[in-house]
Amino acid sequence: MLDNIEVLCHSSIRINKEKIIYIDPFKIDKNYNDADVIFITHDHYDHYSEEDIDKVIKEGTTFIIPEELLTKLLVKGYNKNDIITVEAGKQYITQGIKFKTIPAYNTNKAFHPKENEWVGYIIEIKGIRYYIAGDTDITEENKKVKCDVALVPVGGTYTMDFKEAARLINEIKPQIAVPTHYGDIVGTNQDATDFIRLLHPIIKGIILKK
């Protein structure tokens, strides 16, 4: 399930399966310019980075973005026909890839307000459902997620900490859980280790971050 899936840093994820997909490209080390689809969860600099998008975009790359980012992409000069704006809690399909948006927001801090309608994504590839949570706390919406693989923030401060993330994973019970959002801006490598330690034995915790 995790073949050809990388956590490049922070919450920057690359999936190379039927298509090459980036989620929140950030601190990309060189020009790859190979993205079929780029998913953006919200507009904070460590998730929406135009500098890093330029390193992965190619002719015809499809953007999946929250509505509020549309103006920024158009000002940057990206083709409107290549952009799909999404709402939280909806299902979509692009380039043969099915995906669903899950609201991503804070419940006890002010960094990611619910009313902004920022999102995480459940992306289905070859029948496997990958949940990329975005910047979120435990919410009523993500407690109902059904997925096979979950990539969730564990670093705290702006999102769930490792204890909260483990509690969410133990509730939704994916087969595999991968920690993100630690070790670069907030959170430590120990947070990832402690997250895995707290998982139910039936759930496989794996660190993918380089």
Protein language model features and the residues they cover:
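Core dinuclear metal-dependent hydrolase active-site scaffold
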Residues: 1-33, 84-146, 160, 210
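Binuclear metal-ion centers of metallo-dependent hydrolases, dominated by the metallo-beta-lactamase
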Residues: 5-6, 77-92, 143, 166, ...
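Divalent metal-coordination and catalytic microenvironments
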Residues: 15, 42, 49, 99, ...
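Short, Asp-centered acidic motifs that coordinate Mg2+ and/or phosphate
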Residues: 20-21, 37, 149, 176
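Active-site metal-binding motif and surrounding structural segment of the metallo-beta-lactamase
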Residues: 26-72, 146-151
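Short, acidic/turn-prone active-site loops that include or flank metal/cofactor-
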Residues: 27-28, 44-45, 68-70, 87-91, ...
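Portal/gating segments that form or line small-molecule/metal binding sites
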Residues: 53-107, 119-121, 193-196
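Metallo-beta-lactamase
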Residues: 122-175, 179-188
